[in-house]
């Protein structure tokens, strides 16, 4: 390991920029540094009167284990629209890892979030009607929200504070994907340090 790197898990309250940058945390701790990489979504994003589009891609995924070989690990399902939630744009995708296990994820594009039991009901319906199993074990759960917006996140960078991730505008507004941008922008950051 590198003795110059220390992992700290804190919730960041604020970042001030002067001669040395001070990152203050909810716990009351303060850290100083030359560069800050900030993935927080700025407060200005939550304003509703600025004219920017705000749709949320939100999802609940289960890694499931079934008792019979119902999945083909050589095939995945990207946008299955057979299970619908009310009058929304939604889909389910399935990423099998074996004939018995897969990530099954229900995703919606809406301005407002739905209740957790509604995601769960859609996943249960998909498992029953599309996979053919009501007897399955949930091994892992993931939940996420990705802003789908034309808000200019990246306009908030400074000489020494770099916005990264969603808060840095790395997410493609039309798809919610960020893998390629994360790779490209991370390389640029490393080259400029």
Region roles according to the model:
Residues 2-136, 149-153:
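Predominantly flavin-linked oxidoreductase catalytic cores and closely associated redox partners
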Residues 128, 180-193:
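Internal hydrophobic alpha-helix adjacent to the cofactor/substrate pocket in enzyme cavities
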Residues 86-89, 143-164, 169, 173:
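FAD-binding beta-loop-beta segment adjacent to the flavin cofactor pocket
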Residues 171-181:
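Active-site segments that bind and position negatively charged phosphate/pyrophosphate groups
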Residues 120, 158, 164, 183-186:
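A general structural signal for well-ordered alpha-helical packing
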């Amino acid at each position: 390991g590198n003795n110059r790197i220390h992992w700290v898990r804190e919730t960041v309250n604020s970042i001030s920029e002067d001669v040395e940058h001070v990152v203050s945390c909810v716990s009351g701790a303060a850290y100083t540094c030359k560069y800050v990489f900030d993935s927080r979504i700025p407060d200005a994003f939550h304003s509703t009167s600025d004219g920017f589009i705000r749709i949320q891609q939100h999802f609940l995924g289960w890694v499931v284990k079934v008792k019979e070989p119902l999945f083909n690990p050589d095939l995945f399902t990207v946008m299955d629209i057979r299970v619908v939630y009310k009058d929304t744009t939604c889909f389910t995708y399935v990423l099998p890892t074996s004939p018995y296990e897969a990530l099954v994820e229900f995703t919606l594009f809406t301005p407002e979030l739905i209740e957790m039991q509604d995601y769960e009901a859609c996943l249960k319906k998909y498992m029953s009607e599309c996979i053919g199993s009501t007897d399955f074990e949930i091994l892992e759960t993931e939940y996420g929200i990705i802003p789908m917006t034309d808000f200019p996140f990246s306009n908030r960078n400074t000489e020494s504070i770099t916005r990264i991730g969603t808060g840095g505008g790395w997410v493609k507004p039309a798809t919610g994907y960020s893998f390629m941008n994360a790779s490209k922008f991370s390389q640029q950051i490393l080259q400029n340090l």
